[in-house]
Amino acid sequence: MTDVRVRFCPSPTGTPHVGLVRTALFNWAYARHTGGKLVFRIEDTDAARDSEESYSAIIDSLRWLGMDWDEGVEKGGPHEPYRQSQRKDIYQDVLKQLIDAGEVYPAYSTAEEVEERHKAAGRDPKLGYDNFDRDLTEEQVAAFEAEGRKPVWRLRMPEQDWKWTDLVRGEVEFKSFTQPDFVVARSNGEPLYTLVNPVDDALMEVTHVLRGEDLLPSTPRQLALYEALKRIGVAKATPAFGHLPFVMGEGNKKLSKRDPQSSLFNHRDNGIIPEGMLNYLALLGWSLSADQDIFGVDELIANFDVADVLGNPARFDQKKLEAINADHIRLLEPKDFEARLRAYMTEYTEFPADYPAEKFAIAAELVQTRIKVLSEAWDLLKFLVTADEDLVFNEKAAKKNLKETAVEPLNAGIAALEAVEEWTTPNIEAALNKALIEDLGLKPRVAFGALRIGISGEAVSPPLFESMELLGKESTLVRLKVTREQTPFVVAE
């Protein structure tokens, strides 16, 4: 078997979206699974839309997810350069060879003339180009040139049906009448995507083209161009094509670049970790097994085969992404999770960078099994870095838990905690259990509900006794005494 060579070739426009990165992942996983090579090049021939900011964002997205490449931008390789904007001389040379060989011809017809010819022949005027210019006489060409017309350049499409075995979809066929001669270069001689993309694939010896389903209708054109490139000695072989399924959003609509869920960086900023994102992206059209949704990158590489990719559209499910991410958060080693959480909290929240390391390690351990995304840690931990006088109660939680009956456990809890000399979790737990559970006979939910509101402001927090240890004895007692003063809690009008 020929060594596998796949490519990822995005245009540097906008921010990286889920569909784009899923395509990169499947190419990368296939290269790594087969021991092949991934070529990363940039299609930056649209000066009006391309940007260096977008280019940097694409690089950032791949590096964040841990996807590397064997040759391409930022790395180099035997087929440099890897940006299309730097390969224009190459395209012009290939275009000239195609013209000289008669594979490509000048077409002078305007869109209006094509429509008029269709109407005159009783055909649908919107059928598209009618191949009229393919065999113009020298006199006709001279007449058009005399008018000052500048031709576009079209590839001669063989009059045949187009069939191929798609790596994802199996046997695919397009009838010949659906494939008119198509433009490969503008009237100013500038080659189009329809030419430069296959030329790059040919020169870089790409063996497998894995790309989005939206490009499926253009495959006959690429196959025809490959045949022409082989005839002039530019291409050695035609690659195998595999068309990856659409990623759907809400309802039955394709996930749009404008959808917030489409933005990879939105997910990163919300606290999705790379392992969770990679796992979920892989599930958008592929699965490890019917009963295993959670897997790591090594399992993905060991098992990924493009032949197992489904042809049906994949649906993006935010809740499933977060559930998978939660599993990967729990799989992290505690020290690793602590470091990642600290970096995230420092960058994305108001959590102070100078919070004591030993306390943060405990806090991280308390929330690792309680969050789905890193951003949820802020709501659970912000009480630790809020000044006592600035703590605000969640009104709904306070109204439910700070009734007249809460005064007794608050009094008993405060008295018990004041007597604790060594402020540790076991001592705090023992003192409160004796005072509230044993002596007062309260159930834990009743006994500790008011205390939890008192120290955190919320009905849901990390474990109570550990939270009190982190908060410290002084702040714990100050907050509980303020809570007692505000019990029963009355919502301000």
Swiss-Prot record:
Kindly report the protein's main subcellular placement as a broad class: cytoplasm
Please give one Pfam family short name. Answer: Anticodon_2
Note the SS bond partners.
Answer: none
State the Gene Ontology BP annotations: glutamyl-tRNA aminoacylation
Gene3D superfamilies cross-referenced by the UniProt entry:
1.10.10.350, Glutamate-tRNA synthetase, class I, anticodon-binding domain 1, Glutamyl-trna Synthetase, Domain 2, Glutamyl-tRNA Synthetase, Domain 3, HUPs
GO terms under cellular component: cytosol
Q: Where is this motif: 'KMSKS' region?
A: 254-258
Reaction catalysis annotation: tRNA(Glu) + L-glutamate + ATP = L-glutamyl-tRNA(Glu) + AMP + diphosphate
Q: Which GO terms describe its molecular function?
A: ATP binding; glutamate-tRNA ligase activity; tRNA binding; zinc ion binding
Q: Keywords on this record?
A: Aminoacyl-tRNA synthetase, ATP-binding, Cytoplasm, Ligase, Nucleotide-binding, Protein biosynthesis
Keyword Nucleotide-binding part of the UniProt annotation: yes
Binding of ATP occurs at K257
EC number(s) from the headed UniProt entry: 6.1.1.17
Q: Where is this motif: 'HIGH' region?
A: 10-20
Question: Where does the record say this protein resides?
Answer: Cytoplasm
* Keyword presence, Cytoplasm: yes
Assembly and oligomerization: Monomer.
> Matching PANTHER family, A to Z?
GLUTAMATE--TRNA LIGASE (PTHR43311), GLUTAMATE--TRNA LIGASE, MITOCHONDRIAL-RELATED (PTHR43311:SF2)
Q: What protein family is recorded?
A: Belongs to the class-I aminoacyl-tRNA synthetase family. Glutamate--tRNA ligase type 1 subfamily.
Q: What does this protein do?
A: Catalyzes the attachment of glutamate to tRNA(Glu) in a two-step reaction: glutamate is first activated by ATP to form Glu-AMP and then transferred to the acceptor end of tRNA(Glu).
Q: What is this protein called?
A: Glutamate--tRNA ligase
Write down the species: Corynebacterium glutamicum (strain ATCC 13032 / DSM 20300 / JCM 1318 / BCRC 11384 / CCUG 27702 / LMG 3730 / NBRC 12168 / NCIMB 10025 / NRRL B-2784 / 534)
Q: What is the lineage of its organism?
A: Bacteria, Bacillati, Actinomycetota, Actinomycetes, Mycobacteriales
- Which gene produces this protein? gltX
